[in-house]
Curated annotation (Swiss-Prot):
Listed InterPro entries: aa-tRNA-synth_I_cd-bd (IPR045462), aa-tRNA-synth_I_codon-bd_sub2 (IPR020751), aa-tRNA-synth_I_CS (IPR001412), aa_tRNA-synth_I_cd-bd_sf (IPR008925), Glu-tRNA-ligase_bac/mito (IPR004527), Glu/Gln-tRNA-synth (IPR000924), Glu/Gln-tRNA-synth_Ib_cat-dom (IPR020058), GluQ/Sye (IPR049940)
Subunit field text: Monomer.
Purpose: Catalyzes the attachment of glutamate to tRNA(Glu) in a two-step reaction: glutamate is first activated by ATP to form Glu-AMP and then transferred to the acceptor end of tRNA(Glu).
EC number: 6.1.1.17
Free-text remark on how the cofactor is bound: Binds 1 zinc ion per subunit.
Catalysed conversion reaction: tRNA(Glu) + L-glutamate + ATP = L-glutamyl-tRNA(Glu) + AMP + diphosphate
GN (gene name): gltX
Short sequence motif 'HIGH' region: positions: 9-19
Protein source organism: Escherichia coli O6:H1 (strain CFT073 / ATCC 700928 / UPEC)
Protein name: Glutamate--tRNA ligase
Amino acid sequence: MKIKTRFAPSPTGYLHVGGARTALYSWLFARNHGGEFVLRIEDTDLERSTPEAIEAIMDGMNWLSLEWDEGPYYQTKRFDRYNAVIDQMLEEGTAYKCYCSKERLEALREEQMAKGEKPRYDGRCRHSHEHHADDEPCVVRFANPQEGSVVFDDQIRGPIEFSNQELDDLIIRRTDGSPTYNFCVVVDDWDMEITHVIRGEDHINNTPRQINILKALKAPVPVYAHVSMINGDDGKKLSKRHGAVSVMQYRDDGYLPEALLNYLVRLGWSHGDQEIFTREEMIKYFTLNAVSKSASAFNTDKLLWLNHHYINALPPEYVATHLQWHIEQENIDTRNGPQLADLVKLLGERCKTLKEMAQSCRYFYEDFAEFDADAAKKHLRPVARQPLEVVRDKLTAITDWTAENVHHAIQATADELEVGMGKVGMPLRVAVTGAGQSPALDVTVHAIGKTRSIERINKALAFIAERENQQ
């Protein structure tokens, strides 16, 4: 049997991390079994579904490289198929037309609630032999079995049972002729030959209804697995107040897709004590029986730690392809300065996100208008004039511009003036970067370049001279 899974989001908003984790688990399960992964857009909610949301879902899937083998299929393009199946069910007696008014249904609901009963349709039209005009408004209901129970073996939670007496005669076609969500899902899973449905636990109550419809259609019933929800670190359901929840927001905030994938796969699944997983390892080790039944807590600090790891562990050339977008957001012209891959090597240890890296690299490519006030006050004092002049001359004399030779020039300055390296290094750092912090000074000066570094030292000396004149 060929394994076939699907990810079926509703395009009413962005791709959130919960949906991304569900997509990842479905994708991994299919890849682990050499199967196929289907993308289906469940856009039957015509009022809330938007093209922008569909694009956002696609963007998120593509950014995470969760490639699909079939689709995307759109439910709105399959209405003829759904209605053909409903008409077939009406002929076979597994569905029936219901003419009950909204007023009657509301009165029935209030009566049942007053008695402490679970509100459900009483089956009046199921047993009615009244004649109705062809154009009289009606819905179509599924004739749910009235006895017995539905049992399915959830691959994460174990056996789950629902009594058929608890289930309603579900509306499968509205008065306007449009099929309903629960019915469309059933026909889609049947037509697309889905073998395993991996989805959120909020769908558990839909499962017995869908199984009963599948059985009425004499269609194969897929295997189900319901993933627990994701909570914030306060134990409450993850929402915007916990920070970013959109996949693309994490891209915008400077996270690598590898970091988010690694974090999401571990958010409810484990393989021993291993924390870091390549994509290939995820595929190799992923099993549904290792997925936890309990809700997971989203920990941004852990994600940040993983992101920092991947910034330094992945090839700099690859990280640079993702950094490029953030550089463009900052409007930095990188034509005159180090290659982005070299920048990743320079700033990787200091920066936990690519956004932070892009925001702290401008001095490598563009001259700054002024020095950081605190850093200049502390380090660009008259006492720094001589160290800066000497190190400038030694840097000017370098014919082979390497980080090693830059280091020798700084060391030689300290030795000549018989001062510690900090007495040379800190004024030089502020002079060439405009700030009091940077990566190692020798590689920083080397990356900034000889001409630009010397120009900035002269600018710092002019700043010191002006400061002396004001005293």
